[in-house]
Amino acid sequence: MALDAAVKQTIITEYATHEGDTGSPEVQIAMLSQRIKDLTEHLKTHKHDHHSRRGLMLLVGQRRRLLGYLQKVDVNRYRALIERLGLRR
């Protein structure tokens, strides 16, 4: 389930560190979090959709790796991001 272009743009403007920023860890993690949220809602309705469940697990793993990278590089940015996204860590 891909994100809508409008949703993507709002996430980019909200989490970008500078103008035209689409690849910073903050933006990538925020986009992954939105996709995870959407897939979780989908799986509440379609409990036996195992292909989507596997995709969800891949997204969670990718977000976890990016969070680990951000924590190693800059702890303050990491803490600010998990607080803004409301992630438990």
UniProtKB/Swiss-Prot annotation:
What's the gene? rpsO
Q: Biological process (GO) annotations?
A: translation
**Annotated Gene3D superfamilies:** 6.10.250.3130, S15/NS1, RNA-binding (1.10.287.10)
Keywords, alphabetical = Ribonucleoprotein, Ribosomal protein, RNA-binding, rRNA-binding
Say yes or no: keyword Ribosomal protein present. Answer: yes
An MF annotation (GO) of this entry: structural constituent of ribosome
Supply the PANTHER family for this chain: RIBOSOMAL PROTEIN S15, BACTERIAL AND ORGANELLAR (PTHR23321), SMALL RIBOSOMAL SUBUNIT PROTEIN US15M (PTHR23321:SF26)
Classify the source by domain of life.
Answer: Bacteria
Q: List the GO terms this entry assigns under cellular component, sorted alphabetically.
A: cytosolic small ribosomal subunit
What is the protein name for this chain? Small ribosomal subunit protein uS15
Taxonomic lineage is: Bacteria, Bacillati, Actinomycetota, Actinomycetes, Micrococcales
The record's comment on protein family reads: Belongs to the universal ribosomal protein uS15 family.
Q: How does it assemble?
A: Part of the 30S ribosomal subunit. Forms a bridge to the 50S subunit in the 70S ribosome, contacting the 23S rRNA.
Say what the protein does: One of the primary rRNA binding proteins, it binds directly to 16S rRNA where it helps nucleate assembly of the platform of the 30S subunit by binding and bridging several RNA helices of the 16S rRNA. Forms an intersubunit bridge (bridge B4) with the 23S rRNA of the 50S subunit in the ribosome.
Question: SMART domains, alphabetically?
Answer: Ribosomal_S15
**Keyword Protease attached:** no
- Give the organism the record lists: Beutenbergia cavernae (strain ATCC BAA-8 / DSM 12333 / CCUG 43141 / JCM 11478 / NBRC 16432 / NCIMB 13614 / HKI 0122)
